[in-house]
Amino acid sequence: MKLAAMIKKMCPSDSELSIPAKNCYRMVILGSSKVGKTAIVSRFLTGRFEDAYTPTIEDFHRKFYSIRGEVYQLDILDTSGNHPFPAMRRLSILTGDVFILVFSLDNRDSFEEVQRLKQQILDTKSCLKNKTKENVDVPLVICGNKGDRDFYREVEQREIEQLVGDDPQRCAYFEISAKKNSSLDQMFRALFAMAKLPSEMSPDLHRKVSVQYCDVLHKKALRNKKLLRAGSGGGGDHGDAFGILAPFARRPSVHSDLMYIREKTSVSSQAKDKERCVIS
């Protein structure tokens, strides 16, 4: 699919998007209250930091990408730190494809919560088809936030290393500061690499395009397409990666989430079967 067609397809003014399940992913951010989950999401989506604290019940965002000839959808679920509904927490984990677990370096209780969350993710994901706790493959990063408050640290490095383990392909650790925007880009790049997703999904590796700019961008892409056909070059835009934040995104229904789990599990099983097929 050419860039012009992709950009037009990505625009929310068009009819319902049709993106294959293999290109749809959900990033789930988990952790205690007041550890900076929403601040990390804000940095990811807008690059901004909001100093005022507003308790999160559950925030849902959706972003579309045009990357190397394909369209991707990334849902971002910013969960509550209070988890008043255990069943919803479990559903959030089941629908998650990549996870960010956040604790505050100056709050030991929040670190202990991340310990519990990591185990809960492994336990929950092992319930899916053909999974055991030993072979669960869940892209996951643990973030020690508020690195700007290191003087008040309550968590020892050796404890963190013990939690993360010795397999960087399964779990990685980053000390970050959402306030100072420190190490966030590296963290997102590592997470997407772990999940075998395009590196361009990282905020610093694609052009952020507003919904209002869609039509202009579409016309520009069409113009570049004509120039390429004429052999005049297109200014290089045909190779760019773009990201569009969907306005007014709503959390899918429970039924839709269950169908999502079923479809993703089916896609994963088919991929595993292909890997096992060897022609000799």
Swiss-Prot record:
A motif (Effector region) lies at residues 53-61. Keywords: Cell membrane, Cytoplasm, GTP-binding, Lipoprotein, Membrane, Methylation, Nucleotide-binding, Nucleus, Prenylation, S-nitrosylation. Prominently found in brain at both mRNA and protein levels. Moderate expression in testis and lung. Slightly expressed in heart, spleen, skeletal muscle, liver and kidney. The modification Cysteine methyl ester is found at residue 277. The keyword Nucleus applies. SUPFAM superfamilies: P-loop containing nucleoside triphosphate hydrolases. Its main location: membrane. CDD domains: Rhes_like. PANTHER family: DEXAMETHASONE-INDUCED RAS-RELATED PROTEIN 1 (PTHR46149:SF4), MIP08469P (PTHR46149). This is Dexamethasone-induced Ras-related protein 1. It comes from Rattus norvegicus.
